[in-house]
Amino acid sequence: MLDKLITELDKGLRTLCAPAHSGRAHPDQDIAEADLSAAEKKHALGLMRVNHCGEVCAQALYQGQALTARDASAREALRQAAQEEVEHLAWTERRIRELGGRPSLLNPLWYTGSLALGVAAGVLGDKWNLGFLQETERQVGAHLDSHLSALPPDDARSRAIVRQMRDDELQHAEMAHELGAAELPAPVKAAMKLSAKVMTGSSYRV
């Protein structure tokens, strides 16, 4: 158990402090940079910072869930989702830098809270563990859809990243469903949405 904790601590430090790396090509690599106005660039930066913070939260959530998952298939589903979230971290982090910004200063706070939630979800049992994965990815997918509408129309690079992230998240939700994810109670879903609203509002600015 101590080895597991050390491994997860190392993952956490790398998530928060080290540049992320993608095994796949960046979705925007062949797309030219648009000539955005200062206001458009600022807005795109805020949205991509929100998306990066969301991926930090996802990493922590899945790490916490994997620590307490009992079933091998559930652990593998969480591992696979977490690996793709690392790629999302790399994509959004680079885009933030290209837009002239930096990641949210609140990332450590959100990481800690998400890790605790992940551990708690895993303790409840694998069907609820997968249920949290399924609902998280559904909500993130809907959130990314809203960003596709909100991003500047000419910012094709950010839009390509967000579109691929959305497709990945929905695949994760479907994978969790196929593995027997439980449907979370409505109050839990509402609490998750409220938490996400606070996170998005704060990380857009800070």
Curated annotation (Swiss-Prot):
Q: How does it sit in the membrane?
A: Peripheral membrane protein
Q: In which pathway does it act?
A: Cofactor biosynthesis; ubiquinone biosynthesis
A cellular component term from Gene Ontology for this protein is:
plasma membrane
Q: Where in or outside the cell?
A: Cell membrane
Q: Which GO terms describe its biological process?
A: ubiquinone biosynthetic process
- On whether Nucleus is a keyword of this UniProt record, the answer is no
Q: Cofactors per UniProt?
A: Fe cation
- In which residues is Fe cation 2 bound? 85, 137, 169, 172
The cross-references to PANTHER family, in alphabetical order and at most eight, read:
5-DEMETHOXYUBIQUINONE HYDROXYLASE, MITOCHONDRIAL, COENZYME Q10 BIOSYNTHESIS PROTEIN 7
Report the protein name in the record.
3-demethoxyubiquinol 3-hydroxylase
Organism expressing this protein natively: Chromobacterium violaceum (strain ATCC 12472 / DSM 30191 / JCM 1249 / CCUG 213 / NBRC 12614 / NCIMB 9131 / NCTC 9757 / MK)
Q: Which gene encodes it?
A: coq7
